[in-house]
UniProtKB/Swiss-Prot annotation:
Its EC number is 2.3.1.180. Keywords: Acyltransferase, Cytoplasm, Fatty acid biosynthesis, Fatty acid metabolism, Lipid biosynthesis, Lipid metabolism, Multifunctional enzyme, Transferase. It comes from the Bacteria. Residues 256-260 are annotated as: ACP-binding. The lineage of its organism: Bacteria, Pseudomonadati, Pseudomonadota, Betaproteobacteria, Burkholderiales. Homodimer. GO terms for molecular function: 3-oxoacyl-[acyl-carrier-protein] synthase activity; beta-ketoacyl-acyl-carrier-protein synthase III activity. It is found in: Cytoplasm. InterPro entries: ACP_syn_III_C, ACP_syn_III_N, FabH, Thiolase-like. It catalyses: malonyl-[ACP] + acetyl-CoA + H(+) = 3-oxobutanoyl-[ACP] + CO2 + CoA. Catalyzes the condensation reaction of fatty acid synthesis by the addition to an acyl acceptor of two carbons from malonyl-ACP. Catalyzes the first condensation reaction which initiates fatty acid synthesis and may therefore play a role in governing the total rate of fatty acid production. Possesses both acetoacetyl-ACP synthase and acetyl transacylase activities. Its substrate specificity determines the biosynthesis of branched-chain and/or straight-chain of fatty acids. This is Beta-ketoacyl-[acyl-carrier-protein] synthase III. The last Arg residue of the ACP-binding site is essential for the weak association between ACP/AcpP and FabH. One of its GO terms (cellular component) is cytoplasm.
Amino acid sequence: MEKAMKYAKIAGSGGYLPERVVTNDDLAAELATRQISTSDEWIVERTGIRQRHLAERGVTTSQLATEAARRAMDDAGVQADEIDMIIVATSTPDYVFPSTACLVQANLGAKGGAAFDVQAVCSGFVYAMTTADNFIRAGRARCALVIGAEVFSRILDWNDRGTCVLFGDGAGAVVLKAADEPGILAAHLHADGSQTKILCAAGNVAYGDVTGDPFLRMDGQAVFKQAVTVLDRSARDVCAEAGVEVDDIDWLIPHQANVRILNFLARKLRVPTERVVITMDQHANTSAASVPLALDVARRDGRVKPGQLVLMQGVGGGFTWGSVLARM
């Protein structure tokens, strides 16, 4: 008898943010001590960001990821011994190796299953979700923990007004479980390696020394132009694969990069802004954590409900992008 195909369904979500909240006014005051001028009005007008959470010294990506994972597991009602795969999307791992996923596995007391990291910057969570979905569909996993976690504050040049105001730290997670009915309907992943220089942190560690530029650098205008183009096309492609129209989407949860990008994308897709989940005003850009954090907020406040159609999108350095369409 032919084995029935299993699908991956979101069974629970969780988010975790560092305790320290830094408002735009707080940040402006700190930057002013170094003769760098900015203001709450300047930041909000250009980005939509009002505050961000920053990890204290000594707090690691794996710690944030573990807390988000525990909340997602509680929400899903699963125990550590049920988790047979952990994927962490991060660009700010604790170590060169072992992977952050292995550290999370140990923290949770999960044993024996696969654990590895995915590095696709702000697209990382979408890449990780798609990877876990493929494992579950292939029958190679039944209960996967997918996490996006970052401490981007560690790789920012705090003398660069154009980037240091944009980012925050945090972690978000989902539990994907094998199900008879589709949860994840379709997913598309893409990259264009010729665009590496528009968003990168090009430093590396060799022979005990940091070589190159260790800080995040970004060409904001180029990122905007690329992001709105590829996300629009990706959304239409993933909907077409699933046999639905963009109008059928109940919620759009894009990477929380910049309110201008989100508003422009919503207009191109003709998705009303009231159906776009926006959290960057409170979280700033948390890179791979932004989509799962936004999903968790919208699930817990009752906006995202079971049975609804949710489109999640990531876009980031590489240049990478992707979309996941899921029935909740």
